[in-house]
């Protein structure tokens, strides 16, 4: 028996076996040969060989692909069909007297070396008339080994992503289980016993939002004598006079507010917080980035949790000032909502570790100092300190129902830069902290596994790029093998990977907006595409972190956008203009245009939703980056003149 060297163009060989009604009468074998997309194969030689005797029957499939062996002796037969361009099809069939046997067989054929080698056997080009709708069998061919390599790589990567998909399902399950377990303070501070709080405002070139931030912080509802405000400014532009003037204005009104300017930016944000902590007098440290606008009752909502001396940090949920400004800001809001609703809630309420998000959180001073203080060997100083503090035994509280509004980036390059910094920082923290976490005998296995998935999740970015590159070769394999033969593997993998993402965002939006969440559902395809759009910048971040490449803390530009009509930000300073990455994204856009065409041309329609997610993601990222960059450059030049 000749073993097929490889799976290639799949033929569905459907055989209807009819045994003789009586033992005395010979049996017959009837069947049809059908190409995997439904075209019947004519002119193929079919041989039936009796395994118990030298008896051999031979026939040829007719114009409609059917064949018949009449007067066949009962017994065990091997059916063989073989011709140019088709791998030898072999199957065993048992023909018994007094029984009518039916069997379905699937046969594999090799891809022809000539495009027309199989074409002539398709009945539609001969007896049925007309031309073969698919043209030649395939204009794109791979050799045997390439097929195997691509399939192993493809399903291997999808398998890894599916593991993270299972983890995502677990987060959703934990959220649904614990979402009603709202944390309560151990007790409450009496008004006369309220502790002193220091509010730190780290700034770097925030000329458009610095004054807004300072104005909102001085209006916090807390005894003025117990509130210290530090403006920690590393700026090198007009932010310096703007921020210092705002500080002087409120200092003259009797507020305990001070302005601290550094010229060297040593340690970036972590360095500024570290320097400010040494000069602060508060027992508790509340931190806000420049894009936040805290509500007056912000401190009151968090301070009472510190009546429990084991609590080291209280984190509040982020909400969004400009979520409805554009498609980009809406998608960002949905992505951040899922993190703060699903991830932070599930981790905090099931006894696991979770991290301070860098802003809108309050720290106990001792928790910072006893855990080693602010360190700046990673770009995620907030996550780094969070893990060190929790390993020291400090407990954290997450307040899902208490939110602090913030401005979302409205520019694509700024958004990608922000996500790159976050991705690189988390991987750096993983390299630094995961060995300590796994060696700690006090931590249960579930906590260790939780932190492994949390700190390695960004490794998916380079894997998704590899999937993007091999999408077309995989389509060729699908075409030549038949889609449904691989579909058995696709269904469970896609259920765990792709469907888990949809469930993840759906549950978070439904929780936050129970009456209007359906309005967000139309954005889910764009959310998934945005995840694809970030793969290049995030993959670079991951690789840099893994090989130890150091980079500065690149701030995310903020422009003070709060309403739909505000387009003045397009000509403001800080407008990032990057050309190399959008050009790569354009190249991949063209690649996926061709891949989509190939899928349509080959009738592999079931893959189109996934291909369109890639296409939309890369196209949107590239076009927005280039268009916004050119508009910003033109307006900036006009303003400069």
Regions found by a protein language model. Name each.
Residues 50-66, 70:
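Short, acidic Ser/Thr/Gly-rich low-complexity loop/linker segments typical of extracellular
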Residues 175-182, 188-191, 457-552, 558, ...:
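Membrane-embedded multi-pass helical conduit in multi-pass membrane proteins
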Residues 247-284, 296-379, 390-391, 412-456:
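Long helical/loop segments within the catalytic core of UDP-sugar-dependent glycosyltransferases
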Residues 30-41:
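Structural motif
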Residues 39-42, 68-76, 84:
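Short Pro-Gly-centered beta-turn/loop motif in secreted/extracellular proteins
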Residues 171-226:
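N-terminal signal-anchor transmembrane helix
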Residues 218-260, 265:
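Acidic donor-binding segment of Leloir-type glycosyltransferases
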Residues 51-54, 80-92:
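A short, solvent-exposed loop/turn motif at the edges and junctions
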């Amino acid at each position: 028996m000749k073993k097929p060297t490889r799976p290639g163009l799949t033929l569905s060989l459907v055989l209807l076996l009819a045994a003789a009604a009586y033992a005395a009468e010979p049996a017959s074998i009837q069947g049809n040969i059908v190409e995997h997309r439904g075209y019947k194969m004519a002119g193929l030689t079919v041989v039936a060989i009796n395994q118990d005797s030298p008896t051999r029957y031979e026939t040829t499939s007719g114009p409609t692909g059917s064949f018949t062996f009449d007067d066949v002796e009962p017994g065990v037969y091997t059916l063989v069909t073989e011709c140019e361009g088709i791998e030898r099809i072999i199957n065993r069939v048992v023909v018994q007297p007094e029984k009518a046997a039916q069997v379905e067989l699937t046969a594999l054929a090799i891809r022809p070396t000539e495009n027309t080698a199989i074409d002539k056997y398709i009945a539609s080009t001969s007896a049925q008339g007309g031309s073969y709708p698919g043209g030649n069998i395939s204009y794109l061919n791979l050799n045997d080994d390439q097929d195997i390599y691509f399939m192993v790589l493809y399903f291997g990567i999808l398998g890894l992503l599916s593991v993270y998909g299972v983890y995502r399902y677990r987060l959703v399950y934990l959220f649904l289980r614990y979402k009603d377990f709202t944390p309560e303070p151990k007790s409450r501070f009496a008004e006369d016993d309220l502790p002193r709080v220091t509010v730190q405002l780290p700034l770097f070139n925030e000329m458009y939002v610095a004054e807004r931030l300072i104005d909102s912080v001085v209006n916090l509802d807390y005894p003025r004598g117990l509130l210290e405000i530090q403006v920690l400014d590393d700026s090198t532009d007009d932010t310096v006079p703007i921020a210092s003037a705002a500080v002087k204005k409120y200092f003259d009104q009797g507020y305990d507010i001070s302005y601290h300017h550094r010229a060297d930016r040593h340690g970036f944000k972590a360095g500024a917080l570290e320097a400010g902590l040494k000069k602060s007098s508060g027992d508790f440290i509340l931190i806000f980035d420049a894009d936040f606008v805290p509500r007056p009752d912000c401190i009151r909502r968090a301070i009472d949790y510190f009546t429990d001396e084991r609590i080291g940090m209280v984190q509040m949920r982020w909400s969004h000032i400009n979520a409805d400004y554009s498609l980009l800001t809406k998608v960002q809001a949905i992505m951040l909502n899922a993190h703060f609703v699903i991830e932070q809630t599930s981790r905090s309420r099931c006894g696991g570790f979770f991290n301070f998000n860098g802003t809108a959180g309050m720290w106990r001073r001792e928790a910072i100092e006893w855990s080693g203080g602010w360190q700046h060997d990673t770009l995620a100083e907030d996550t780094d300190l969070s893990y060190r503090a929790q390993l020291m035994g400090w407990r954290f509280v997450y307040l899902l129902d208490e939110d602090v509004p913030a401005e979302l980036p409205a520019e694509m390059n700024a958004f990608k830069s922000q996500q790159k910094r976050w991705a690189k920082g988390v991987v750096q923290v993983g390299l630094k902290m995961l060995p300590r976490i796994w060696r700690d005998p006090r931590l249960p296995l579930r906590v260790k596994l939780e932190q492994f998935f949390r700190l390695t999740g960004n490794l998916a970015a380079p894997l998704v790029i590899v999937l993007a590159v091999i999408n077309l070769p995989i389509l060729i394999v699908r075409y030549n093998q038949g889609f449904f033969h691989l579909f058995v593997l696709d269904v469970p993998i896609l259920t765990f990977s792709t469907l888990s993402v949809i469930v993840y965002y759906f549950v978070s939006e439904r929780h936050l907006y129970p009456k209007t969440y359906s309005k967000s559902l139309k954005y889910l395809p764009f959310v998934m595409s945005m995840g694809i759009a970030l793969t290049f910048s995030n993959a670079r971040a991951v690789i840099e972190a893994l090989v130890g490449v150091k980079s500065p803390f690149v701030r995310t530009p903020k422009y003070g956008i709060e309403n739909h009509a505000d387009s003045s930000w397009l000509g403001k300073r800080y407008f990032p203009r990057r050309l190399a990455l959008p050009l790569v994204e354009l190249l991949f856009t063209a690649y996926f245009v061709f891949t989509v065409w190939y899928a349509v041309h080959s009738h592999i329609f079931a893959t189109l939703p996934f291909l369109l997610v890639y296409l939309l993601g890369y196209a949107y990222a590239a076009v927005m980056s280039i268009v916004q960059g050119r508009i910003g450059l033109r307006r900036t030049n006009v303003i400069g003149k």
